[in-house]
Amino acid sequence: MICPKCTSLSIVKEGTRKRKTGRIQEYSCNSCHKWFVVPVEKEVKGERESIFLEDIEPGDILEYKTDKVFRLYCATDVHHGANEHHYDKFNEFIDEVDSDPNARWILNGDNIELIPPNYKISQRGQSMEPDEQHISFIKRIEHIADKLLFIRGGNHDMIRSVNILGFDVSKVMADILRVPYYRMPGYTRIKVGDVTWYFVSGHGKSGGKNGDLELDKMAAVYSDGDVFFLGHNHQLYAKPLDSLRVLGDKEGVRRRWYIRGGSFLEYADYARYSFFPMVRTGWATIEFAKDKIRAWTN
């Protein structure tokens, strides 16, 4: 096996991902530290492998499998193209993902600002046109797209583009970057060796001050979750929730996590006008191991 990035022969076979179209094998390169994937069973449509062209529909479960500890870097509410987008902070995120050999990451909606013409709010809130936002953002992240687990749309990108044009800009981004696309909230099954964890994620809808209330609703619907992750309200925190369960003839502690993923948007004019609370920019990182899950904010 030769690395397609740098042609090195120093390749390590990593975990696999299960898809509806088959299974893909992941590899990492010891020379350039990049990752690439090879379909275990190739199915070709035209000139592209169908394995990358996948929507995770409501009710479907995406699976990621690995034999070692890995860290999931969660980017939500990036708002690339907004006047107040925090370029330095998101560049820091990109560098972290790029330098971590055990990294995977997600895009969880509101990835670009996307204020279309004649929309209910002024286009003055963005620093470039929507098409330029889409193109420049893809160029900005494409060198770490090999570590991207999935993309989800939010109210800024997916909902606006679908309602106005019947065109899902987030789905197109996922197709270009060849990663699965979540249109709705849902489970991701994560297998670390013989241990299975369930990561529940969605963009979010509520702007309420208490971010736990929406996470409570999510946990009630997705009751098998171990980690519950939402964006949208730009709050940034990760906190454990412990409960008691039955382990044989004794009680044991089950730990789950509530996470609001923050944003990469500084104090915008609309927030200032409405006296929204000021929150720091940043992201959440989740580490999945065989024995436990850890989570923290950056």
Which residue stretches match the model-derived regions?
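Core catalytic region of metal-dependent phosphoesterases/phosphodiesterases
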Residues: 55, 59-61, 66-71, 75, ...
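Cysteine-rich micro-motifs
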Residues: 21-35
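Short, non-ligating residues that shape and space the ligands of small metal-coordination modules
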Residues: 12-14, 35-39
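Short Cys/His-rich local motifs and their 1-3 flanking residues in nucleic-acid-associated proteins
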Residues: 5-9, 31-35, 233-235
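Short recognition patches in nucleic-acid-associated and regulatory proteins
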Residues: 5-22
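Short metal-coordination and nucleic-acid-contact micro-motifs, chiefly zinc-binding Cys/His arrays
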Residues: 1-2, 23-25, 224
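Conserved beta-sheet core of the metallophosphoesterase superfamily
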Residues: 198, 205-296
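Beta-strand-turn-beta hairpins that frame and shape the catalytic cleft
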Residues: 62-73, 187-199, 253-256
